[in-house]
Amino acid sequence: MYGVGVGGGGGGNYDGGGGNASSLFGGGGFMPSQATNAAEGTSGGGGGFPKSRNAQALLPLTVKQIMDASQTNDDKSNFAVNGMEVSTVRLVGRMLNKLDRVTDVSFTLDDGTGRVPVNRWENDSTDTKEMADIQNGDYVIVNGGLKGFQGKRQVVAYSVRRITNFNDVTHHFLHCVHVHLELTRPKSQVNANTATGTPNQTMPRDSMAYNQSPLTNQASTFSAPQNTGTGTNMIDLVLNVFHDPAVMNDDHGVGVDYVSRRLNLPEETVGKIIIDQVDLGHLYATIDDHHYKSTMNG
């Protein structure tokens, strides 16, 4: 139905010319507007997505969803997808028309459902190197803020990462489908599942970019982690720092050094865990590549 197809398996060799991303994604967009009314009628009570957690949550979206997003107020600076306010988004697609300037890089992102302008400010040498390594024709993951300017929509990127494993493309589009289904699910179905204690078995843990419980709570359902220095327990410790209300209320997020000091763990170890959790959609970069927040906004 959603037709997300990826040619080839791994590898990162692409030609920079000819064609567009439709040949890769196979028409992988979908039509969220068909069920929007159901989501917009969801308010209050259990289930659904409370207004207070909407705007800052990182949502995986397609370009078509961005272009179809409704504007939520008179100054036309806020957007909503399926009734949920959106400010921070994740997109996956092909970089086109890259233009390097002294302070920033602009390009067009094509994901097969449409095209959107993207701007990435280069605040330091790390940002410059990140963008220098990516060229026209590369497929990228973009995390950034959705903005409106002169009647047009664009993304101001916080991070741009070149894709080397094409499972990331499939994962992103499946994630988009799942988010769409969750946002448009009738309230009665949400409440019925809550009342009967029926778990939502369609959502794997790695695909949740919102409304997640801390991972330590999930792990305790099965068994408590037995090791104290590596593996799941260390990941939980790092994520729990980002789930701290004081950290979640900080718009800029926190850096690797902060987490390292708080947990008394090596910065290199913490940094690797954070990068892995960014790739899984649990964390995202904010003002630069050194500050991160949880995608759970609760």
From Swiss-Prot:
Q: Its GO biological process terms? A: DNA replication; double-strand break repair via homologous recombination; nucleotide-excision repair
Indicate whether DNA-binding appears among the record's keywords. Answer: yes
- Family in the record: Belongs to the replication factor A protein 2 family.
Going by the UniProt record, its keywords in alphabetical order are: DNA damage, DNA recombination, DNA repair, DNA replication, DNA-binding, Nucleus
User: Main localization of the protein?
Assistant: nucleus
Q: Which residues bind DNA?
A: 89-163
Reply yes or no: does the keyword Transmembrane apply.
Answer: no
Q: Which organism is it from?
A: Oryza sativa subsp. japonica (Rice)
Q: How is it modified after translation?
A: Phosphorylated in a cell-cycle-dependent manner (from the S phase until mitosis). In response to DNA damage, recruited to DNA-repair nuclear foci, as a hypophosphorylated form.
Q: How does it assemble?
A: Heterotrimer of RPA1, RPA2 and RPA3 (canonical replication protein A complex). Interacts with RPA1A and RPA3.
Extract the CDD domains matched here: RPA2_DBD_D
Per UniProt, subcellular location reads as: Nucleus
Q: Which GO terms describe its molecular function?
A: single-stranded DNA binding; telomeric DNA binding
State the function annotated in the UniProt record: Component of the replication protein A complex (RPA) required for DNA recombination, repair and replication. The activity of RPA is mediated by single-stranded DNA binding and protein interactions.
* One cellular-component annotation, GO: chromosome, telomeric region
Protein's recorded name:
Replication protein A 32 kDa subunit B
Which domain of life does the UniProt lineage start with? Eukaryota
